[in-house]
Amino acid sequence: VPEGKICQTILELYNKDGIVVEPAGAIGISALEMYHEKFTKKNVGILICGGNNDITRMSEIKERALVYSNLKHYFIVKFPQRKGALKEFVNNVIGENDDITFFEYVKKNNRDYTSAIVGIELKFSKDLNHLTQKMKEFGFFGEYLNDKPETLRFLI
């Protein structure tokens, strides 16, 4: 069962039913949701437990659930080293339903371009193609990080 699916289940149980579960307690429900067709017309028991959950990690759990749901994306974005580049990125690339949730940039002197790590939350997962097309069209696209788990671990 993917880690993101477990995080999604933890959040659903908390938000819908007020149940605080630990990751191990959510695995059974996650597996049942993913493979429900294998359990049709069968009796299934699932143990739900929550004693080993640190509630302060909810933001991390939410982040991983959003990445798993294809709603949160991280990029290396190439910015031209000139005034107005960030404004151009926001005006020409970011959609009205997109939200920049992470931005890390260090200005470098004597370079034509510099890079920023940008996290963007989408309202709809289908908007990812449009977002990356706009980045490429305006020359901002550097690299997509969601498919690089080792790099992504540094961010979430």
Regions found by a protein language model. Give the residues of each.
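Active-site-adjacent helical/loop segments in soluble small-molecule enzymes
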Residues: 1-41
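A short, charged, Gly/Pro-tolerant segment at domain boundaries
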Residues: 26-27, 46-52, 150-154
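A conserved regulatory-domain signal marking ACT and ACT-like small-molecule sensing domains
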Residues: 55-156
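Short, glycine-/Ser/Thr-/acidic-enriched flexible segments
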Residues: 5-6, 26, 51-53, 82, ...
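Short glycine/serine/threonine-biased micro-segments
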Residues: 16, 23, 43, 48-49, ...
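Catalytic phosphate/nucleotide-handling subdomain of diverse soluble enzymes
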Residues: 33-63
